[in-house]
Amino acid sequence: MSDSQGNTINLDGIVLKAGGHTKRDAEALCVMEAVAWVAGEPHSDHPVCACPVIGAFLRQWNDSISTDEARTRLLKPLVPRLVGSKSTEAVEVRRSYLALDWLAREYAPAWLSLRNDLKAHAVALRGLAPLTDTASCAAAQTTLDAALAAAGAASRAAAGAAAG
């Protein structure tokens, strides 16, 4: 693979790391810094060529994966695909709603369903209409607020129990 200046870039040797890095080093890059490198851009975790919505999602995911091996295995294949992913504002708004919808109707319910006292909230979230615009988000707000409040209460109760 080559960057925009024709320099050869070998992604095989890259191990993705958590956090931001002050300089470009093939042995210490996060996923979005690798995208900037492949694109031939200055060192940054906010490459101009990449969709900012996808970039925000991937920076968070990059830093939440607990091992370099898992991070590299999951995220490195995405690096070449992210170069040139920046699009119009309308496309980026659509992508932001897709991410929000996934978070509210898939990700959160997966975790809530692990606790018997939160399963009803998981079911309610999964039953929401797709979150595609401000109107659909407003219609879902009561259900989202209830799930958040219940999860927060469960978290505080668990912390209190752990503290003794």
What positions do the PLM features span?
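Short, glycine-biased loop/turn motifs at secondary-structure junctions and
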Residues: M1-G164
